[in-house]
Amino acid sequence: MFKLKINNFQLGFKLVQWPVTNHLLKHFYVFPINNKGGLAIKRIISLALFKKRLNKDKINNCHVWEEELPDGSYDMGFNGNFNHMEKRKSGYVTQKQFSEFKDANNQRLIKIETTLAIQGEQINKLTQTVEKQGEQINQLVQVVLLQGASKLENFKWSKKHKDKSLMPAWIVWKIFWWKV
């Protein structure tokens, strides 16, 4: 039994390492729950009650206690050698199994993120290539329009003036700007 005096409260408590049995141990001890003088009464409970409260399995030797709070509710604490169980849709799994499952999912998500990042970079490169090709196509279209306009005016000029001379450059520019 340890005795401790805090804020004019004399506290006594006893920690018991119990074997895994189904009988109820009734060792009470008191701990302060805040710095305003509030107290919580803790008692050691049996493993059966602990299993009933948590609805878990596979608990070995451990320290387990129940804390009765001033509002009438309770809080439970434990430490020692046991496998804490997490409930999932498929049933109960140990903390180790859950962490392995979580690590596997994290690795899978990291692979997906890296492939998405690589594909995003590839898409950016392809968009830049498409933009460059679009600019080249626009330049080629302008060249084709200029050549087509000059041939058309040369044809009209040669019919009108009955000679095969080339049309003046200012007429080509005038036709080009008029069509654009």
UniProtKB/Swiss-Prot annotation:
Gene3D superfamilies given in the database record: 6.10.250.40
InterPro entries: DUF16
Source superkingdom: Bacteria
Family per similarity comment: Belongs to the UPF0134 family.
Protein name: UPF0134 protein MPN_127
